[in-house]
Design a protein with these regions (language model features):
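Short beta-strand elements in bilobed, periplasmic/extracellular small-molecule ligand-binding domains
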Residues: 91-105, 221-224
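Short, well-structured alpha-helical segments in soluble
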Residues: 111-123
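Glycine-rich phosphate-binding loop
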Residues: 127-140, 238-274
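Positively charged, low-complexity intrinsically disordered leader regions
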Residues: 38-65
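Anion-binding alpha/beta catalytic cores of soluble intermediary-metabolism enzymes, centered on
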Residues: 130-195
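Glycine-rich phosphate/diphosphate-binding loop of Rossmann-like nucleotide-binding domains
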Residues: 74, 79-88, 168-258, 262, ...
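Rossmann-fold NAD(P)-binding glycine/threonine-rich loop
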Residues: 143-148, 152, 161, 267-323
Length: 326
C-alpha cells in the first residue's frame, strides 16, 4: 500500500544536523546527501522526553483539575509489570494521579469489564489504559472498545483511530507514533516532500505512523512496507526517513538504508545473549551497523521507548484539559 501526499515537492529545505544537506535534483525530488563518511547522530528519546515533561508540568499547573490515569494489568508478565511501574513513576514525577489495578491471570473477563465501566463513570479520572498482553481468554479488542474514547489515552479505540484517518486532531493519538513525530520535530526534521517508509503495518504503530507522516502539516510521501512487499529492502533504501516497526531483531541492515537517511527504530526485542549475566539483551529492529550509514538514528533502548511513555502522559493531560472544559 502506498500513500501519496498531494503536495508538490520542490524548493530547498534546511539541513538536518551537520551530517547531511538537502539537494534538489532535476526531477524536483528532495534527497538526503551525505557530506562525508558518517557516524549517525543519536536521536535521543530520553532527552526529548525530558523536554516534553517540562512542558507538561506547565500545562498541569494551569489545568483546573489534577490529571488522573488508571492502569489495569492482568497476570504476572514481568515485562508488563516493568512497563506499568515506569508509567506510574512518570505520573509521580509530573504530579499526575495514578490508580494501579492488578488482577491475577485467571481473572474472569467480566471483572475487567466492570472495572472499565466503573472508570468510565468517574468524572475525576481522565485516562484508562489496559496493559498488554492480556491472558488468552480475554478479548483485548472488545475491552478497548468499552473505554470512553475521551479516556482512551492509548489511542486504540476505533473512534480515535477513525479521527486519525480523517486528519482530525481532536482525538487521542497512539502514543508510539505520536512519540516518533515529537522526536522528529524536536530534532528539527522537516518531513515536507520527503520520501518516508514505514516498515510494518500494525494498527497501533505502523498504520497510524503512516497516517501522521502523510497528514497535512507533515506532508511526507509515505510508503508502507509489509510482509507481502515484493522487495522490502529496495523500498527501504529509497527512504529519506525510515521508521522500523516490524518486531524482528536487527532486520534492517546498513544495505537497507540510503546514505544520510534518518532512521527511527521502534522495535524492542529480547534476544538471547550468553555474554550477559541475565542471558539476554534488548535489540531493536535496526542493526547497529546502520549507524555508519544513517545521519540520525534512534537507539534501543533510550529512543522511542521513553517517548511512548511521555506521550501517554501528554494524552492524559490533554484528556483532563478537554474534560474540564466540558
Amino acid at each position: 500500500m502506498r500513500l501519496i501526499c498531494n503536495q508538490a515537492v520542490g524548493g530547498s529545505s534546511p539541513s538536518v544536523g551537520s551530517k547531511i544537506s538537502i539537494q534538489v535534483n532535476a526531477n524536483a525530488q528532495t534527497e538526503l546527501v551525505p557530506r562525508r563518511a558518517m557516524s549517525a547522530t543519536r536521536l535521543d528519546g530520553k532527552a526529548c522526553a525530558a523536554d516534553l515533561e517540562e512542558r507538561l508540568k506547565n500545562r498541569i499547573s494551569e489545568c483546573s483539575v489534577q490529571p488522573h490515569l488508571a492502569v489495569i494489568i492482568v497476570g504476572d508478565d514481568p515485562a508488563s509489570h516493568v512497563y506499568v511501574n515506569n508509567k506510574v513513576r512518570s505520573c509521580g514525577r509530573l504530579g499526575i494521579k495514578s490508580t494501579h489495578v492488578e488482577l491475577p491471570a485467571d481473572t474472569d473477563q467480566e471483572v475487567v469489564v466492570q472495572h472499565i465501566l466503573d472508570m468510565n463513570k468517574q468524572d475525576d479520572l481522565h485516562g484508562i489504559l489496559i496493559q498488554s498482553p492480556l491472558p488468552r481468554h480475554m478479548d483485548e479488542e472488545m475491552l478497548t472498545e468499552l473505554i470512553d474514547p475521551r479516556k482512551d489515552v492509548d489511542g486504540f479505540h476505533p473512534v480515535n483511530l477513525g479521527r486519525l484517518v480523517q486528519g482530525r486532531s481532536d482525538g487521542m493519538v497512539p502514543c508510539t507514533p505520536s512519540g516518533v513525530m515529537e522526536m522528529l520535530s524536536w530534532a528539527n526534521v522537516d518531513l515536507t516532500g520527503k520520501k518516508a517508509v514505514v516498515l510494518g503495518r500494525s494498527f497501533n504503530v505502523g498504520m497510524p505512523q503512516a497516517l501522521l507522516m502523510a497528514a497535512k502539516g507533515a506532508d511526507a510521501t509515505v510508503t508502507i512496507v509489509h510482509s507481502r512487499t515484493k522487495d522490502a529492502q529496495a523500498e527501504c533504501r529509497e527512504a529519506d526517513v525510515l521508521i522500523a516497526a516490524v518486531g524482528r531483531p536487527e532486520m534492517v541492515k546498513s544495505d537497507w538504508v540510503k546514505p544520510g537517511a534518518i532512521v527511527v527504530d521502534v522495535g524492542i526485542n529480547r534476544v538471547d545473549d550468553s555474554s550477559r549475566e541475565r542471558g539476554w539483551r534488548l535489540a531493536g529492529d535496526v542493526h547497529p551497523d546502520v549507524s555508519e550509514t544513517a545521519s540520525l538514528l534512534s537507539p534501543v533502548p533510550g529512543g522511542v521507548g521513553p517517548m511512548t511513555v511521555a506521550m501517554l502522559m501528554a494524552n492524559t493531560v490533554t484528556s483532563a484539559e478537554m474534560m474540564s472544559d466540558d
